[in-house]
Regions:
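Substrate-binding pocket helix/loop in short-chain dehydrogenase/reductase
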Residues: 47-59
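SDR active-site lid
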Residues: 120-167
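Active-site loop immediately N-terminal to the catalytic Tyr-X3-Lys motif
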Residues: 49, 98-102
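Conserved NAD(P)H cofactor-binding loop of Rossmann-fold oxidoreductase domains
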Residues: 39-44
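Residue(s) in the substrate-gating loop at a strand-loop-helix junction
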Residues: 91
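Active-site helix of classical SDR
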Residues: 71, 107
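Rossmann-fold cofactor-recognition segment
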Residues: 5-19
């Protein structure tokens, strides 16, 4: 599924980042942008050790490997022009235990660590990196992933809407 929108020099491109080839397609189709917002937010629900190998690999690549590959594909151009901004959307799950969401949590921890590392590294290239760790965002994703019990277990004051998360 792809949407390419160009209005006032802004492009939005949607690809299936579970597929490493899609990441390459993006960097071939769109020159290095001024701003990259890397956000992947899906999960699997289940006990550790019970995940289907392919589903686990696809999810981990989407949440961590695909995000890193996308950013890495643009870094040479951003470094060459000595400018850019990268926003990586991780999760509070990178810092807190998430029973029955271990793949999600570990992948979000991976991009959190990656983002903090490249933040230090890219300062000298005038490229700004921000890693966001939103808390519990109320979306249909929890229900689809079989995690609707979270709404009962986590106090309501800890939840935010998607609109609040993007502010």
């Amino acid at each position: 599924k792809q949407h390419l929108f160009d209005k006032k020099h802004t492009q939005f491109l949607s690809k299936d980042l579970r597929n490493p080839n899609a990441v390459l397609e993006i960097s071939e189709e769109v020159p290095a942008p001024d701003l990259i917002v890397a956000n992947a937010g899906v999960t699997l629900h289940g006990r550790a050790g019970s995940f289907d190998v392919d589903k686990k690999a696809n999810l981990y690549y989407l949440l961590c490997g695909g995000v890193i590959d996308l950013i890495e594909s643009y870094l040479p151009e951003m470094r060459e022009r000595r400018s850019g901004r990268i926003v990586i959307i991780s999760s509070i799950g990178a810092l807190t235990p998430m029973p029955k969401s271990s793949i999600y949590s570990s992948a979000k921890a991976g991009i959190f660590a990656y983002g903090r590392s490249i933040h230090q590294e890219l300062k000298k290239d005038n490229i700004d990196v921000t890693v966001s760790l939103p808390g519990y965002v109320r979306t249909a994703a929890h229900k689809r992933a079989g995690l609707d019990h979270l709404e009962r277990q986590i106090p309501s004051w800890m939840w935010i809407t998607a609109q609040q998360a993007v502010r």
